[in-house]
Amino acid sequence: LFNEERFRSIPIHYRLNRIPSYGFIFYQHRSAASTNNQFIPYPFYARPVAVRPHAQKPQWQDQPNVYPPTGARRPRPHASFIAIPPKKNQDTTAIPAINSIATVEPTLIPTTEPVVNTVVIPEAASEFLITNTPETTAVQVSSTVV
């Protein structure tokens, strides 16, 4: 408890300058030099100030932060002018925007005709085999040519 009280009374800048992990990061140690010496480089440049004995400050009028309007203001219409008036005829049916009288053309689906393949079997030369591709059925037809 005695060490904490004694450590708390030490100023913070003295404490940070004495601890190397903090002091060299936060405080740049440089030698004291006057700012008006032209031979010593100094990181901060002072602004030259011209002093006149009888110079008057310009007296500016305090103006608001918004710009004044450039022309005459146009009147705003009242809110009732913008509102949509109610419909007068509630009994009549509304005309739809879409033309429902137009005929709807059905979409044509392309039909595939069955392809007939004629295959000659060497064992039975007198018979032809006809097959339909979609149904894959075989039909034997006897020919008159021998």
UniProtKB/Swiss-Prot annotation:
Summary of the tissues where the protein is detected: Mammary gland specific. Secreted in milk.
**What subcellular locations does the record give?**
Secreted
The chain's coiled-coil residues are none
Asked if Phosphoprotein is a keyword of the record, the answer is yes
Q: Name one Pfam family in it.
A: Casein_kappa
Phosphoserine modifications at: 143
Family matches, as InterPro entries: Casein_kappa
Q: Which GO terms describe its cellular component?
A: extracellular space
Q: Where is this site: Cleavage?
A: 80-81
Give the GO biological process terms: lactation; protein stabilization
Q: Glycosylated residues?
A: 107, 112, 118
Keywords, in A-Z order = Glycoprotein, Milk protein, Phosphoprotein, Secreted
PANTHER family registered for this protein in UniProt: KAPPA CASEIN, KAPPA-CASEIN
Functionally, this protein is described as follows: Kappa-casein stabilizes micelle formation, preventing casein precipitation in milk.
Q: Would you identify the family this protein belongs to, as annotated?
A: Belongs to the kappa-casein family.
- Name of the protein in its database record: Kappa-casein
